[in-house]
Amino acid sequence: MTPFFLNSVLGGVLATLFMDVASMLVRVTGLTAGAPPSTIGKWFTYLFHGRLIHGDIMASPEIPIRMPLVGALHYGIGIALAGAFAALCSWQQPQRGAFAFAVGFGVLTTVLAWFLMFPAMGWGIAGTRGPAQLLLTRTSLVNHALYGLGLALWSAFLAPLLIRSKA
């Protein structure tokens, strides 16, 4: 396996895991409040049934949520984003100087939630029509910054120990 592939997969999984754990810890401070996982799971599950856009996801009929598929999609997105980050960096072996860039990249991925996911859930751009509008917007920003921090930690500390690049 190539260093690029390993960095994409391992970096994506670890950055997503870091985001998931850190966001739970941040949530207890009251700074953020996640949309209920069942709501996001409902939207993801509807994707598997061919429906992307909802008037309001909360009002859409209940559907059996396939959490293993939802989890796989969640981590798959994390891997794909880590691959995009790696490609932007021409990342064979991550560099310690990419720390700030990784956090910035994580923040930049917020546009996916603000301009794709929230509007598709019927919550408007940046969640401005969703439940607890600004809290939802801030939560997305914080969570994606945490994903970027996970990428930064991977690239600065773990990848150099675990992946040998062909020089």
Residue ranges with predicted function:
Residues M1-A167:
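Juxtamembrane/disordered regions of integral membrane proteins
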